[in-house]
Amino acid sequence: MLKPVVLAAAFLSAFTYDAQARNHRHHYGHRAHAWCGSYLSSYLGKPDRRLALARAWAREGYNAGGPGIGVVVVWPHHVGVITGQAPNGQWIIHSGNDGGAVRTRPRSTAGAIAFRRV
């Protein structure tokens, strides 16, 4: 009788693992893998750790009044700098963490919360 119980326990233990829940504040105050703000800070030569969060750029510099070349564009969870304008009218944005990489591409500014000169 004991042998089947031991075998069953051994079998079941092969398919279980320790589940460890993360503390609900594990990434308190920022998104876990967001690095666009940190990249832009380095790219523009502004070594300020508070600029690691994209939204912090909405208070940096002064209001540009709208998009333009050299303007930092801020979305709720992303930030980049405008480097040009495509023939179709879209602004060309240079940013980090755009699809997990540093990219320069035409992009809509819809949903932007700030345009800043820094």
Language model: regions and residue ranges:
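N-terminal capping segments
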Residues: A9-G61, H94
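Aromatic- and glycine-rich peptidoglycan recognition patches
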Residues: Q20-H30, T83-V118
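Solvent-exposed, polar/charged alpha-helical surfaces in well-ordered, non-transmembrane soluble domains
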Residues: S38-S42, G68, I113
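...with weaker cross-activation on analogous glycine-rich loops/strands in unrelated enzymes
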Residues: D48-A101
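Sec-dependent signal peptide recognition
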Residues: L2-A8
